[in-house]
Structure formats: C-alpha cells, structure tokens
Amino acid sequence: GLIKKKFNGVPHYLIDAKFEPGNYGKIQFSPTLQCTYDNLNKLHKGSKPKYFEYFEGDKKKNVIFEQWYPEDGGRFYLKRVKNMIIETEDDIVASESHIWITMYQLKQLLKKDNLVNAHLRSVISYL
C-alpha cells in the first residue's frame, strides 16, 4: 500500500527504501507498506508493520484505490496481493527508511534500473 499526502497542495507519496537479499545494487524503493499475510497477522509473534493502521486499522480513511491481484502476475499458485493507495491529512513522520516524494521524483527513480521494486510499480500503475 502507498500513502498519499499533500504538502502545500502538492501530492507526495511515502515510499520505503529497502535493503533486502536479492536486491540488485544496494536498495530498492517499495510502497509504504509491503508485507505478507503472516506479518500482518503476527503469526511469527512480531510486531505489526509500520503504517499498518492506515491500511487496515483505525486510521484507514479515504481509500483512493484498493484491488486484489495475482502475486507476481500469477506466477505463484493461488497467491494474491492487495494493492492500495490511501490519502491522509494526518501529520505522518517518515521513519528512518521512509521518505516523502512527489510523482515527478518517483518518475525520475523509474528511469534507473532496479531502483523501484515491482510492488511499487504495480501500485502506482493506477495513478
């Protein structure tokens, strides 16, 4: 899921810089929230992912887009992902790994190979 917020009338999107095994290069930018069913439901006894409450919790408001898709274009049998874009007026402080960017800035990132992951590309395709 992706959180949208306007700063001085300009839409910004909260994205996450992830260091994950298998990433080509150092980091990839991903949606605000990208997690598995097990993470969401704390099946491994961990804590809820950052910003979860904006997508499924008490702060879920103003859903711009919400749609289920097959995982990785149907490559994974019976796996599905939910893409969401929500807009908020809340004052959200970006965590250490998150950053607010404009669509123009995001488009500039898309020009570089392997900087924007497939999940973020999928979510912004609605925009």
Predicted regions and their residues:
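Short beta-strand micro-motifs enriched in acidic
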Residues: K5-F7
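Active-site ExK catalytic segment of metal-dependent nucleases
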Residues: L14-E20
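Mixed-charge (acidic/basic) macromolecular-recognition segments
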Residues: V10, P21-G25, S30-L127
